[in-house]
A protein has these predicted regions:
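Glycine-rich FAD pyrophosphate-binding loop
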Residues: 23-42
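Dinucleotide-binding Rossmann-like beta1-alpha1 core, especially the glycine-rich loop
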Residues: 45-129
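Short beta-strand to alpha-helix junction loop
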Residues: 55-65, 132-148, 244-248, 308-309
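C-terminal catalytic lobe of FAD-dependent flavoproteins
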Residues: 148, 269-325
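N-terminal Rossmann-like FAD-binding beta1-loop-alpha1 element of flavoenzymes
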Residues: 4-29
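Helical element adjacent to the flavin cofactor pocket in flavoenzyme catalytic cores
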Residues: 133-166, 172-175
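Central helical "cap/lid" subdomain
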Residues: 34-37, 163, 169, 176-217, ...
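Flavin-binding catalytic cores
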Residues: 72, 209-211, 228-230, 238-279, ...
């Protein structure tokens, strides 16, 4: 008889765990009251990048493993994954190229002619940025990828049940393991005061002729991410519980992205808001034995790196579960 796994949450972490468990022979069920574009994952720009998550000594190895998995998926035209060059800029001073980025082939960008061998000189944006670096990374079109994961999960025998889990005791006892991918919801579900919501708002605009993703983490935070059928303008990152779109934020986002790209402000198709589940003490990926004897494996607190960490964390969760059962 197959081991049974109950997974709480249908964002990218929950769906990826579901795929890994189901494809490794588990009888897996996902419990979630929000799916697809209604999840926090649906509001993500979803460019692979270790962003807004701790600790670095775990985040970077997990990110690199997931980089490899997503690069493989980019070969499947149905997955919603592709490879894209990202230009990471700074407005003041120099942006250091992290060692992990160098190992992936990152090269410096200068807005003025550079004597650095292998550097890329960008004539655009000279008055806006000082320098940056270019790197090829996986890009996830969430409008395709989340459905791809859900279909892959179903095809492997998995089930998604619509349910709002208020307490873990509501999970039927005939499951061998419970996997907690509740994101910011883990704060109430498991009384974790280390979680704080980092609010992100984006504006989806019509598709632009943009060959690269443009990102700047300096204030004001901005990014323009080209996708299959549209473009994501962002963004915000503030500690807030507010899931409602802010008209002022939308105006600021579209204005800054348009200014950087040197274009007229495009019409906004839709505005999305998500609460990044940042955990002050770092991503929680560990096994816990509940007072009733059941096993929970936590997988949450990924901050702004949910897609970036998804496959490595899911594989580690499944490995822990396999040793437990």
């Amino acid at each position: 008889m197959r081991n049974r796994a109950a997974i709480i949450g249908a964002g990218v972490s929950g769906l990826t765990c579901g795929v890994v468990f189901a494809e490794r022979g588990w009888d897996a069920t996902i419990f979630a009251d929000e799916t697809g574009q209604k999840t926090t994952s649906g509001a993500a720009a979803a460019v692979w990048f270790p962003y807004d998550a701790e600790p670095a000594d775990k985040i970077i190895p997990w990110s690199l493993i997931t980089y490899g998995r997503l690069r493989e998926l980019a070969c499947d035209s149905q997955s919603g994954a592709s490879m894209l060059e990202i230009w990471q800029f700074t407005r003041v001073g120099l942006v250091p190229i992290p060692d992990w980025a160098k190992n992936l082939g990152a090269r410096p960008i200068s807005v003025i002619p550079s004597e650095v061998e292998g550097s890329l000189t960008i004539p655009a944006f000279p008055s806006l940025f000082s320098n940056g670096y270019a790197l090829n990374v996986p890009l996830i079109d969430t409008t395709i990828y989340l459905d791809y994961l859900a279909n892959r999960f179903h095809n492997a025998g998995g089930t998604i049940e619509s349910a709002h889990i208020n307490k873990v005791e509501e999970i039927p006892r005939d499951f061998d393991v419970i996997v907690n991918c509740a994101g910011i919801g883990a704060r109430e579900l498991f009384h974790d005061s280390q979680l704080e919501p980092h609010r992100g708002q984006v504006a989806i605009v019509p598709k632009l002729d943009l060959a690269q993703a443009i990102v700047c983490d300096d204030a004001p935070l901005m990014y323009a991410i080209p996708r299959t059928h549209d473009c994501v303008f962002g963004g915000t990152n503030s500690i807030s519980e507010n899931r409602e779109p802010s008209a002022a934020d939308t105006t600021a986002i579209v204005s800054e992205c348009s200014r950087v790209l040197g274009i007229e402000a495009p019409p906004v198709i839709v505005v999305k808001v998500g609460l990044r589940p940042f955990r002050k003490s770092g991503v929680r990926l560990e096994r816990e034995r509940l007072s009733d004897g059941r096993t929970v494996i936590h997988n949450y607190g990924h901050g702004g790196a949910g897609f970036t960490l998804s496959w490595a964390c899911a594989e580690e969760v499944c490995a822990i579960a396999s040793r437990t059962s």
